[in-house]
């Protein structure tokens, strides 16, 4: 696949078939995605691949616990989960944003039907969070994980698969850690 074409054809895909995705395909995507750059080239990520029906349902339920209030904010014309605890007013395109989020709501309600979910963790000891002392929310730490995640999205496109990134599960990390028996020191 040509790079610029891949960059333009890797949207957030929120409608899926129930066609199975083979282990070989998952391995190929992850094996190539792991070459993503990371701070200090530490590559402290770990991926939990979820194909079990019960686990997918539990992950989807946890996702909806965060999605539902986020969507409610949008219906009220605000952007939820702002770093200062407020919901900032949407400045442009409120109706457009809400209409797009309605499609995302369909995904949130049916997430458990997706053939494969991947939960991406990072070993916190590998991160150099250079903006942690600034008077704003940190954005640097995720930089060592999102390169991998984007490579996964591109790999899925290369394999003819749809994909979508969501970060809402991070707020449910404790429950996810219990579900996946995640060791201490990792962030979702």
For each of these PLM feature ranges, what is it?
Residues 113-116, 161, 184-187:
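Short coil/turn connectors at secondary-structure junctions
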Residues 35-41:
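Glycine-rich phosphate/pyrophosphate-binding beta-alpha loops
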